[in-house]
Amino acid sequence: MQLNERKLKILQAIIQDYIYTAEPVGSRSLSKKYDLQVSPATIRNEMADLEDMGYLIQPYTSAGRIPSDKGYRLYVDHLLQLEKNMVIQRDQIRSDLLNRFGEIEQLLQYSSKILSQLTNYTTIALAPQIKEVRLKHIQLIPMDEHHLLGIIITDTGLIKKTVLQVPEGLDAEAISKISEVINGRLQGVAIKGIPGEFTEEFTHELEQLSHGFDSVIPKMFQTLEELDKIELFLHGTTNIFNFPEFNDIFKAKSFLSMLEEKELISQLILSSSHKGMNATIGSENIYKEAKEYSLVTATYKIDEDVIGFVSIIGPTRMDYSNVMSTMGQVNKYINEVLKGKYK
């Protein structure tokens, strides 16, 4: 049995109808709503074939059909019509990015927030793992005679700050020299490789500049380890209540509980991320907790360096056309800003 043009048209109509109504689709209603140019009986036979082929399923309580994950996958890959002429707040997005955001985390949060507002789905931003990026600059700024503000900047624009306790008698000139030595040795080094750079010779060089500075080094290591913690930014979590799938309070609680599992969510996003934009649908997700949901994930890069991910998550009955069109437009604007901002 093959998927001919008629079967594809009927499958497309069923999926679009189910996305908009959340109700199982019957042959008679389908023939009334869509110009398929065949009788309800023919539609019914084609629907039976599509079910046998695994593209549709029949709920126990209904005579109608709903799409399977396999059906959604075919729809997204081959039948989906993106809204190429979609108009969203391009100038506002560019203005916000250019004027208000200097750190990658802020950019990811903003992207997640605007996508949640535009699509009415839950969105998740995942910051990159710090160990995968390179050090651009470390700055040490005196706060008082006992403390420094350490600012760590990566090549992808991540900025992390920490307060360091320092030995007494460390003057501004010594701090400046120490910063110069550290940057000279570590600039361009991958974060995960920095511990290996603190050889006995390098540590001795720092101690020569300031006796007791070796006590500061473990604190710097600790800061770098803390930077590698998973950072997720959620927006629109209550948007799930817009969908009838979550009228069941237990299902809604299960979804919200899943969002609290940072490791699970981060692995879901990483497993669904590819070049550009990608959708994972229902059973394609790697965890059973996410088998009833779809994720559309965008990967943000500067040159070839990944700086983060943003995912839109919702029921498999997701409005893929709107979601992927909106995400594509927002990503285009953000990438335009990234190219100018971090090069």
UniProtKB/Swiss-Prot annotation:
Classification via Pfam families: HrcA
MF terms (GO), sorted A to Z: DNA binding
Provenance organism: Alkaliphilus metalliredigens (strain QYMF)
Superkingdom as given in the UniProt entry: Bacteria
Listed PANTHER family: HEAT-INDUCIBLE TRANSCRIPTION REPRESSOR HRCA
Keyword Chaperone: no
NCBIfam families with a match to the protein in the record: hrcA (TIGR00331)
InterPro entries in the record: GAF-like_dom_sf (IPR029016), HrcA (IPR002571), HrcA_C (IPR021153), WH-like_DNA-bd_sf (IPR036388), WH_DNA-bd_sf (IPR036390), WHTH_transcript_rep_HrcA_IDD (IPR023120)
Functional description taken from the UniProt entry: Negative regulator of class I heat shock genes (grpE-dnaK-dnaJ and groELS operons). Prevents heat-shock induction of these operons.
Keywords: Repressor, Stress response, Transcription, Transcription regulation
Protein's name in the database: Heat-inducible transcription repressor HrcA
Keyword Transcription regulation listed: yes
GO biological process: negative regulation of DNA-templated transcription
Record-stated family: Belongs to the HrcA family.
